[in-house]
């Protein structure tokens, strides 16, 4: 055959010489497309640009503007970094280096920790290798030959990976004298890598196992052009200013203490107030929507965790204690007590749906290496609810939860994205049950009118789920809300209800959180608002500031009125300059400063100014109380 025909995305067919590659196809369409092309898709699968085409293939050309481009660019840049490290530190052993959401990383086994100066040298070497315009070439070897190759190179980690894969053949990529084990695809040449930056260094255990070697993980990022890279780096600098750990200290919200233990938050008065405001908000919103507030114990007998399956599947993340020779597990989740409440009496179909809500504090043994401020802790409180309903009610209940999420995220000013994760290969439950639950989740997503993605096979073994990721002011995604169908617990705990025909039936169960972990959500809020909380959330809503000591009696009376009305107010009557006191209140990000001078004392007024420096009209204490109450009611 001297000629082949391939199908383009628009359905048209294009003839090409036999043996033509995706690059040849791009060149046949136009010089501009050939220049922009970086990879391709054959029958929906991503492949390298120089991959030969078969007759009848459906082909799509991937350019720097394609959705898939960034991952390919970043993955190739991680290989470029590994090549640079091997050139500078020949004794280093390479492990893995994937593309991730914010860029890429590569883990190295080295004799000494990398320094910031090392990063600069590595980055400079990467630029040199990129300019060298090295071809990036793919080849396939038998696993035996690949193992022999990497053993000869002293790359023990690659040998382990190939042995664990258990495949007959593996693919390798080479550029210059550097060879790596990889599925690909990759860019055609190193010169296609134009805009990158190494950002940080961290430690990481090989394969996440604390018993294995500690490696040096180098993080970086890469983009299609320098403009995108510079914009990203500017966002990173802004994120550093907003870091909730930094602001948490500066605003005196919370702390951690090694004497207390890693991952255990100590809430200071202002932080505890912020948390209380959120929890009160949660209770009110749940009661409005027909949830019953419940509370469960912190420890439950180990036999119960064995029955639920947590002991078998989750015990490494649990804490256990023994009381009166009886083993107990500290709860990592709130669901079991809710099961006990349901089982405490006979249930009729007329009782359903039942919606149990608990602000439940749980503890999970997270590895020390993954702990990160409020975003990853060992003790936290979830806005956890479990809905038990009939199969016919499932659609409406899930739609109700999505509407709940939509309304709550709107109050906080967050946009969000949704993903449906479907049945994995290993799962329990009948086909009918999975179909019912997946259909209910999918119908709710469609009815929401919002875009969503489907992650095939990424559900839990006991049921499909919807994950909801909010977007903050820096356009970062945060996993918070989850809606999860569960077939396991109703079965294991023999939950039943009496149907209209008098028969016992199994209820459907939905686990769901709206904000998720309160600690994590507060961390996100701090960074989203940069500590400038809206008035309704601010731990301190106003501070009364005197000009001189002469105004203290009037200012104290005003302070007492505001506090009695429920306004979260503090006072600064120190003998300091007014500008100093105002600046300090601004640094504490307090929404309103109420200045009291001789004029205010004479007129019985307060002189409010917003934290951005804008002056408001003078108000009486009573008027200011009404003003704040209106802001709180409208969630401003």
Curated annotation (Swiss-Prot):
Entry's cofactor comment: Binds 1 zinc ion per subunit.
Protein name stated in the entry: Threonine--tRNA ligase
Task: Give GO terms: molecular function aspect only.
Answer: ATP binding; metal ion binding; threonine-tRNA ligase activity; tRNA binding
What is the documented function of this protein? Catalyzes the attachment of threonine to tRNA(Thr) in a two-step reaction: L-threonine is first activated by ATP to form Thr-AMP and then transferred to the acceptor end of tRNA(Thr). Also edits incorrectly charged L-seryl-tRNA(Thr).
Primary location recorded for the protein, binned into one broad class: cytoplasm
Location of region: Catalytic: 243-534
By sequence similarity, the record places it as follows:
Belongs to the class-II aminoacyl-tRNA synthetase family.
Q: Does the keyword Zinc apply?
A: yes
Recorded source organism is Geobacter sp. (strain M21)
Q: Which residues bind Zn(2+)?
A: 335, 386, 511
Q: What is its EC number?
A: 6.1.1.3
Task: Specify the taxonomic lineage.
Answer: Bacteria, Pseudomonadati, Thermodesulfobacteriota, Desulfuromonadia, Geobacterales
* Quaternary structure note: Homodimer.
InterPro entries, per this entry? Answer: aa-tRNA-synt_IIb, aa-tRNA-synth_II, aa-tRNA-synth_II/BPL/LPL, Anticodon-bd, Anticodon-bd_dom_sf, Beta-grasp_dom_sf, TGS, TGS-like
User: What HAMAP family does UniProt report for this protein, alphabetically?
Assistant: Thr_tRNA_synth
Required cofactor(s): Zn(2+)
| Reaction it catalyzes | tRNA(Thr) + L-threonine + ATP = L-threonyl-tRNA(Thr) + AMP + diphosphate + H(+)
Q: Which GO terms describe its biological process?
A: threonyl-tRNA aminoacylation
User: Which Gene Ontology cellular component annotation is one that this UniProt entry carries?
Assistant: cytosol
Q: Which residues form the TGS domain?
A: 1-63
- Keyword terms of this UniProt record: Aminoacyl-tRNA synthetase, ATP-binding, Cytoplasm, Ligase, Metal-binding, Nucleotide-binding, Protein biosynthesis, RNA-binding, tRNA-binding, Zinc
């Amino acid at each position: 055959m001297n000629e082949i025909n391939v199908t383009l995305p628009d359905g048209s067919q294009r003839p090409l010489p036999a043996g033509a590659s995706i690059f040849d196809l791009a060149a046949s369409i136009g010089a501009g497309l050939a220049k922009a092309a970086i990879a391709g898709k054959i029958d929906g699968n991503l492949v390298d640009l120089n991959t030969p085409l078969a007759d009848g293939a459906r082909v799509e050309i991937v350019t720097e503007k394609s959705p898939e481009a960034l991952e390919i660019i970043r993955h190739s840049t991680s290989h470029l970094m590994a090549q640079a490290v091997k050139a500078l530190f020949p004794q280093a052993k390479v492990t893995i280096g994937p593309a991730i959401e914010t860029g890429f990383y590569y883990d190295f086994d080295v004799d000494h920790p990398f320094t910031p100066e090392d990063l600069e040298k590595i980055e400079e070497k990467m630029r040199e290798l990129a300019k060298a315009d090295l071809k990036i070439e793919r080849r396939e070897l038998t696993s035996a030959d690949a193992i022999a190759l990497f053993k000869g190179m002293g790359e023990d980690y690659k040998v382990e990976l190939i042995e664990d894969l258990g495949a007959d053949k593996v693919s390798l990529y080479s550029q210059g004298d550097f060879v790596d084990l990889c599925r690909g695809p990759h860019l055609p040449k190193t010169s296609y890598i134009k805009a990158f930056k190494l950002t940080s260094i961290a430690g990481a255990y090989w394969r996440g196992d604390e018993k294995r070697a500690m490696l040096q993980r180098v993080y970086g990022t890469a983009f299609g052009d320098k403009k995108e890279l510079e914009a990203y780096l500017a966002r990173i600098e802004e994120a550093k200013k907003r870091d909730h750990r930094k602001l948490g200290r500066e605003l005196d919200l919370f702390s951690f203490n090694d004497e207390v233990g890693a991952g255990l938050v100590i809430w200071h008065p202002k932080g505890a107030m912020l948390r209380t405001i959120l929890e009160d908000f949660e209770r009110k919103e749940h009661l409005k929507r027909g949830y019953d507030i419940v509370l469960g114990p912190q420890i439950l007998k180990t036999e119960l965790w064995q029955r639920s399956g947590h002991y078998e599947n989750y015990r490494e993340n649990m804490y256990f204690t023994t009381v009166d020779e009886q083993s107990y597990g500290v709860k990592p989740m709130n669901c079991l007590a809710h099961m006990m409440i349901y089982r405490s009496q006979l249930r009729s179909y007329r009782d359903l749906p039942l919606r149990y809500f608990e602000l439940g504090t749980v503890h999970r043994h997270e590895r020390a290496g993954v702990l990160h401020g409020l975003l990853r802790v060992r003790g936290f409180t979830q806005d956890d609810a479990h809905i038990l309903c009939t199969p016919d009610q499932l659609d409406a209940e899930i739609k109700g939860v999505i509407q709940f999420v939509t309304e709550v995220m709107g109050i906080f000013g967050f946009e969000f994205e949704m993903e449906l994760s479907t049945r994995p290969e290993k799962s329990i439950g009948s086909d009918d049950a999975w179909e019912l639950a997946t259909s209910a989740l999918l119908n709710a997503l469609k009815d929401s009118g919002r875009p969503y993605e489907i992650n095939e096979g990424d559900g839990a073994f006991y049921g499909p789920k919807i994950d909801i990721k909010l977007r903050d002011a820096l356009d970062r995604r945060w996993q918070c809300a989850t809606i999860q169908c569960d077939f396991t617990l109703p079965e294991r705990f023999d939950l039943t209800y009496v149907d209209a025909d008098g028969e016992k039936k199994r209820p459907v169960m939905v686990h769901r959180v709206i904000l998720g972990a309160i600690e994590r959500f507060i961390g996100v809020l701090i960074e989203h608002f940069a500590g400038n909380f809206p008035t309704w959330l601010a731990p301190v809503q106003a501070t009364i500031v005197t000009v001189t000591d002469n105004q203290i009696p009037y200012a104290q009376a005003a302070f007492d009125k505001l506090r009695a009305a429920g306004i979260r107010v503090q006072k600064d009557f120190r003998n300091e300059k007014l500008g100093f006191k105002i600046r300090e209140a601004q640094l504490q990000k307090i929404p309103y400063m109420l200045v009291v001078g001789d004029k205010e004392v004479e007129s019985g007024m307060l002189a409010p100014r917003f934290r951005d420096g804008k002056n408001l009209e003078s108000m009486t204490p009573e008027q200011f109380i009404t003003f704040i109450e209106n802001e709180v009611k409208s969630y401003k």
